[in-house]
């Protein structure tokens, strides 16, 4: 068996489009390919013994074929196929037909037997009597079968983001496939997302739009979430857990939905043993008492026992230890020498409960400990964490890893993992609005963790999922096959993704646009342009002028020009795209780029208003004020458009967060002088101001030679830093 990439050759039967000035035609001469759809559609055969996940995946695959061709294949459970061509989807343990193919040497099941989430995809000649060809998708387990199936879905043109980002599917009348592939095991065992801070996006969208009958994020929403995770080759979900949302387990069907898709449920660092204490439905202090293990242990244990009784029969990863309510510190004003033994006792009690409910040794149950905020202090003050529990290291909330495993920790049986943020709510400032974490930064920081053994558990905080499509895809691709990336390839990953969706002719435009998008946000995210801190002392709160200067080094002018350039580029591409692609492009590219330009324009023009007013240039000040107000209104217009596209499919998703945590969304104060005609200010760049006096700048990209030896290395890395090119040592 060749260990090659899956290759699919697609042909569209010749057809004429009546009433238009062109025809659509392509060769259909391939006689070697597997006819997934030709004059008829191939049935999809599964085994009734393979369980609900394989059945769900087969039904989704049938839906994918319908999206491409308009034809719906049958999903059957017959053990004696009576057709010339068929698709077989299943696991090698649960599908006797696949077992027999393996025994006959027609597929290499030994390569994936007893492996984690691997698959074989192969066109098999004469697999059984009366069958001429079969497209065989055999998984080592239920998720392996799913990943193999969705690899075929992507090859025929169905994006994992077909629903969540409205990526259109190109129609074909005929699908001829070639396939011969054995997958590797994923780089990271558990890979998934945490839906967080959903108050101003996913929750209002689900409650008032997608799941109105429930009025909450419930099983219908989670079905779409789980499907997306599976299509992105993930396997794990930490559900939404803010108090505005009904806790995951309060809607009985949600856990059944996750299990149907084969998705493992985990929880955040502050939800021990699957219990969401941020929700009053789970923990009500008026009824249940204080969330304090030292004083209210029995009530807390009773809650955990109840949760394990209803959930332990499913695949879960259990958060151990405990923090305070929601994201607060541990309750009780205890010194450190009392905190450490208390948390050790909590963990011991939790493991005893898990062992009793699961009826297997605690060492065999997936568990995590997250040293985050005050629990990091407790850990570093001597907390003894059982060796089989996975340590999950956390970034600093802004993309930089605070800690990775030391040599001793790397020897632990439980290994380590990562909890990483693309979205954050908290001090000193949130960034919930747009996706601005540079892919190279993500790669460099995750590589530090991966190289020190963090390959067990990767969880990504994605906020509301939208508009984090690009960053989420990059993270999941890392987790699936980290070694396929390096510092040279990572910065092109997202541009290539966009080019596959919207057209290769835009590839260089996408690369430039994304480079500038991330570079400009590197020095200041759009959410930080108000120059204030949140939840801080009064002197640090309230909108302020930025520190970008209009007088020195063209700082403000260049920033405005840079954002305007990519905003205009996004608009030009949108105009050039065919109509079916425009909604998806608006969601993933056009809205973020245009909105961040207007956010910068709003604050910088307000700042210019203040400066010109102080200089007595009242006409210029009035012009700057109107520019700031126009930018403010433009953000509202763009957001309204986001919520209106596709007949309001995403209505509520892009609601702006309220001022108590997002002052930057407000209009800064400006001064307007009555009876004074506006006069535009000159915002052109003066090249004489570009450089520091008496300084000489060397562009290291123009090097002629780099000398490295065994002890040290020097390399230039693109896609990171203020200049977007850095020298990396070591």
Language-model regions, residue ranges each:
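An acidic-aromatic substrate-binding cleft motif
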Residues: 160-214, 220-240, 414-417
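Catalytic domains of carbohydrate-active enzymes, especially glycoside hydrolases
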Residues: 214-243, 253, 257-266, 313, ...
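Extracytoplasmic
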Residues: 669-730
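C-terminal non-catalytic alpha-helical accessory regions
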Residues: 167-172, 494-662
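Contiguous, structured surface segment used for ligand recognition
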Residues: 20-185
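The substrate-binding groove and active-site-proximal loops of carbohydrate-active enzymes
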Residues: 47, 134-139, 196-219, 235-245, ...
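Gly/Pro-rich turn-and-neighbor structural signature
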Residues: 75-77, 168-176, 249-250, 257-260, ...
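Bacterial Sec-dependent N-terminal signal peptides
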Residues: 1-26
